[in-house]
From Swiss-Prot:
PANTHER family: LARGE RIBOSOMAL SUBUNIT PROTEIN UL30M, MITOCHONDRIAL RIBOSOMAL PROTEIN L30. The gene is rpmD. One of its GO terms (cellular component) is cytosolic large ribosomal subunit. Part of the 50S ribosomal subunit. This is Large ribosomal subunit protein uL30. Keywords: Ribonucleoprotein, Ribosomal protein. It holds the Pfam family Ribosomal_L30. The keyword Ribosomal protein applies. The lineage of its organism: Bacteria, Pseudomonadati, Pseudomonadota, Gammaproteobacteria, Aeromonadales.
Amino acid sequence: MANTVKVTQTRSSIGRLPKHKATLRGLGLRRIGHTVELEDTPCVRGMINQVYYMVKVEG
């Protein structure tokens, strides 16, 4: 199985750039405190880097 990362949304998407809101949706995050487990790929890492100030990453 591939390596995975746990991503948790820690801040609200209200008032953020539409591009950043779309990135959160692309990661599968819906609300503050919501956690998803994703494959650790360059694509996912790029999305995390774009919204680093709204998420916490483990693993």
